[in-house]
Design a protein with these regions (language model features):
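N-terminal, positively charged nucleic-acid-binding surface of large information/translation enzymes
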Residues: 1-103
């Protein structure tokens, strides 16, 4: 996030329009396992981590323009619209990906 902030500021100083979007990915087995290890429900675990991440950015004077949580309804709506747009523009016969998401 620090490097992204440096690049954003450099672009702005250089006369370019630049934005920094950051946030937290709050889905997947890693979240479930970490929440279980902490003895917290996944939502509470994510709320805590998201707040820590925001505090860290503030203390480091990182100037993000957008903070996105993958559990936010606005994020879900945008992703849904994106996938619908892709589906509408996809070549005929394009199949669905079925596989493991976690790395």
């Amino acid at each position: 996030m620090v490097l992204a902030d440096v690049i954003k500021r450099w672009k702005q100083i250089s006369g370019h329009e630049a934005y920094l979007a950051t946030g937290t990915d709050e889905h997947g087995m890693k979240i479930q396992q970490a929440a279980l290890k902490e003895g917290l429900p996944p939502k509470e675990f994510c709320d805590n981590n998201s707040n820590k991440f925001k505090d860290l950015a503030e203390h480091a004077n990182i100037s993000h323009d957008f903070f996105i949580r993958t559990t936010d309804q606005e994020h879900k709506d945008v992703v849904q619209q994106f996938w619908l747009l892709l589906k509408a523009r996809a070549p005929e016969g394009l199949g669905l990906y079925k596989g493991k998401h976690e790395g």
